[in-house]
């Protein structure tokens, strides 16, 4: 048998063994070669073994089972557990609400309570002698905005001929400084930056007596009432009067002017200034008029020790009671004119963290001094950059200018901005309680706290050598205590600030460098 015959026989056997693989419609001759179109049919092995399907309980059977004692008891048990759990959660919520400490009601806050005030007594010295006066001030509003100040105390800028009351017009702007339209534009621009304008209306600011002669008091009062109404209609947010100690019947006039100011809106501010550092005289002025801010030389009457500064602050707060305070070292001068250079950073920290409104003069954020060579002592030029002070015969150091300090993270300007930002957003610093801590004569330390908000600890070293602070908390009220450690937010020592910022410092033996102030933060603990 040939090889071809054997292949054919195998095909026949496969076709006989697997008929299901044959094409259903193939011709006889093509059946052997067709490989597609095959159909496989699976036949159940045993159709007779199909089981009976379970259709579940009928309605009658289900009701019978559900009504059995076992299921009834189960349902009642589950229902009882549900309601007991619900009542337990309700009771727990009530207990939490009842036992939780009550939040203190927030005090009424006006805009001058929420940040610092910035004084520009000499407009041309601030913007530059040839910078356009009031119009030039508009270009510096962005800079003031970065300082986070809430109000700008401007002037005096009204027409005043030295010691001539008839040539003094409190309603008109000195034409060398700008026009009424320039001032209205300034008001609108400042409003967009959320900066309020307070106008200084000290009448005879270029003369010997700021309020003219005592016999002319009635004439001054009449002019003042007319001017107040006029400027309020223009949109001014408040007024400042300096040297009120030289004004006859000052309490009477201040009360009258306050009524005029408040009649238009409660959101208007009145500021009085005095060169006096006598606490009783200051209190007498404050008691004459409600909601009055008073700037004075009270804090400059210091021997610059921690003990002396603490005494001044606590006596002032005790004497003024619940009345809102303001803090400055003078009614118009620069901080550096009254405070030594090595304490400027310390006093910035102090003024921003005491309860009340801090008041600064232009240049205080830089450490500007009034006695620089080539500058008038009462009105130093604002050092925007090296070329802006062309009257000085020698170059100005870069770190004395706004430009230079802007670029220095350890500068006095940077510290001012950080403190101003904290002062404006932290409730404990905005309107929190104040408690002085016992410490050594070289230190002044205190706590600011409000309800359940973050608390702040301020420690100031007035000594020219390092100190370890042992803080006594025995005089703190119930519910207030010092923690074992606190987070360092700010140090007036720029080297330490960059090295230890946001680190936790132990308070048991807190170490301070010479003339260093620390601002520390710790949380409320129920």
Swiss-Prot record:
GO biological process: carbohydrate metabolic process; isoleucine transport; L-alanine import across plasma membrane; L-histidine transport; L-leucine import across plasma membrane; L-leucine transport; methionine transport; phenylalanine transport
Composition-biased stretches (Basic and acidic residues): 7-21
Site of covalent link Glycyl lysine isopeptide (Lys-Gly) (interchain with G-Cter in SUMO2): 59
Location of the region described as Disordered in the Swiss-Prot/TrEMBL record: 1-31
Membrane side Extracellular: residue ranges: 100-526
Gene Ontology cellular-component terms listed: amino acid transport complex; anchoring junction; apical plasma membrane; apical pole of neuron; basolateral plasma membrane; cell surface; lysosomal membrane; melanosome
Domain of life from the UniProt record: Eukaryota
Membrane-side (Cytoplasmic) residue stretches: 1-75
Impact after mutating residue 103 to S: Loss of interchain disulfide bond. No effect on guidance of SLC7A5 to the plasma membrane
Record: glycosylation sites: 166, 259, 263, 301, 318, 385, 399, 509
Localisation: Apical cell membrane; Cell membrane; Cell junction; Lysosome membrane
Transmembrane segments: 76-99
Keywords from the named record: Amino-acid transport, Cell junction, Cell membrane, Disulfide bond, Glycoprotein, Isopeptide bond, Lysosome, Membrane, Phosphoprotein, Signal-anchor, Transmembrane, Transmembrane helix, Transport, Ubl conjugation
Post-translational note: Phosphorylation on Ser-300 or Ser-302 and on Ser-420 by ecto-protein kinases favors heterotypic cell-cell interactions.
Gene ablation phenotype (knockout): Embryonically lethal between 3.5 and 9.5 dpc.
Alphabetized GO MF terms: aromatic amino acid transmembrane transporter activity; double-stranded RNA binding; exogenous protein binding; L-alanine transmembrane transporter activity; L-leucine transmembrane transporter activity; protein heterodimerization activity; protein homodimerization activity
Location in chain, cross-link Glycyl lysine isopeptide (Lys-Gly) (interchain with G-Cter in ubiquitin): 42
Family designation: Belongs to the SLC3A transporter family.
Assembly and binders: Disulfide-linked heterodimer with a non-glycosylated light chain (SLC7A5, SLC7A6, SLC7A7, SLC7A8, SLC7A10 or SLC7A11). Interacts with TLCD3A/CT120 and ICAM1. Constitutively and specifically associates with beta-1 integrins (alpha-2/beta-1, alpha-3/beta-1, alpha-5/beta-1 and alpha-6/beta-1), but minimally with alpha-4/beta-1. Interacts with LAPTM4B; recruits SLC3A2 and SLC7A5 to lysosomes to promote leucine uptake into these organelles and is required for mTORC1 activation.
Protein name: Amino acid transporter heavy chain SLC3A2
Organism ancestry: Eukaryota, Metazoa, Chordata, Craniata, Vertebrata
């Amino acid at each position: 048998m040939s090889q071809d015959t054997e292949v054919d026989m195998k095909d026949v056997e496969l076709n006989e063994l697997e008929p299901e693989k044959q094409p259903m419609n193939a011709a006889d001759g093509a059946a052997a070669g067709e490989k597609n179109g095959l159909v496989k049919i699976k036949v159940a092995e045993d159709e007779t073994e199909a089981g009976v399907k379970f259709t579940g309980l009928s309605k009658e059977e289900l009701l019978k089972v559900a009504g059995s004692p076992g299921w009834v008891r189960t349902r009642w048990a589950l229902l009882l557990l549900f309601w007991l759990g619900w009542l337990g959660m309700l009771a727990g919520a009530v207990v939490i609400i009842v036992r939780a400490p009550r939040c203190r009601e927030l005090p009424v806050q006006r805009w001058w309570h929420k940040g610092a005030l910035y004084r520009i007594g000499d407009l041309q010295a601030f913007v530059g002698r040839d910078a356009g006066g009031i119009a030039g001030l508009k270009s510096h509003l962005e800079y003031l905005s970065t300082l986070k100040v809430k109000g700008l105390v401007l002037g005096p800028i009204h027409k005043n001929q030295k010691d001539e009351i008839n040539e003094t017009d409190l309603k008109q702007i000195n034409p060398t400084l700008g026009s009424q339209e320039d001032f209205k534009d300034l008001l609108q621009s400042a409003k967009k930056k959320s900066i309020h304008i307070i106008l200084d209306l000290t009448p005879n600011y270029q003369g010997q007596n700021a309020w003219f002669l005592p016999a002319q008091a009635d004439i001054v009062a009449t002019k003042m009432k007319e001017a107040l109404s006029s400027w309020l209609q223009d949109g001014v947010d408040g007024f400042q009067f300096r040297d009120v100690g030289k004004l006859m019947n000052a309490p009477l006039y201040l009360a009258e002017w306050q009524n005029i100011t408040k009649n238009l809106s409660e959101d208007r501010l009145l500021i009085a200034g005095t060169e006096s550092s006598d606490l009783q005289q200051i209190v007498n002025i404050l008691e004459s008029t409600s909601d009055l801010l008073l700037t004075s030389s009270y804090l400059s009457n210091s021997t610059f020790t921690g003990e002396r500064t603490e005494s001044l602050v606590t006596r002032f707060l005790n004497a003024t009671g619940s009345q809102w305070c303001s803090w400055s070292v003078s009614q118009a001068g620069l901080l550096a004119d009254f405070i030594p250079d090595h304490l400027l950073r310390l006093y910035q920290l102090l003024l921003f963290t005491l309860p009340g409104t801090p008041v600064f003069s232009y240049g205080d954020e830089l450490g500007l001094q009034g006695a620089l060579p080539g500058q008038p002592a009462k009105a130093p030029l604002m050092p925007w950059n090296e070329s802006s002070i062309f009257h000085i015969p020698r170059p100005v150091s870069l770190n004395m200018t706004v430009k230079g300090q802007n670029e220095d993270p350890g500068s006095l300007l940077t510290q001012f901005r950080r403190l101003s930002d904290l002062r404006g957003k932290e409730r404990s610093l905005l309107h929190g309680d104040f408690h002085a801590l016992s410490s050594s004569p070289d230190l002044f330390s205190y706590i600011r706290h409000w309800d359940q908000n973050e608390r702040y600890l301020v420690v100031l070293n007035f000594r020219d050598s390092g100190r370890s602070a042992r803080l006594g908390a025995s005089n703190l009220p119930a519910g207030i205590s010092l923690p074992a450690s606190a987070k360092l937010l700010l140090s007036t020592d720029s080297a330490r600030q960059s090295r230890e910022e946001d680190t936790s410092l132990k308070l048991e033996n807190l170490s301070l460098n010479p003339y260093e102030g620390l601002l520390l933060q710790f949380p409320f603990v129920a």
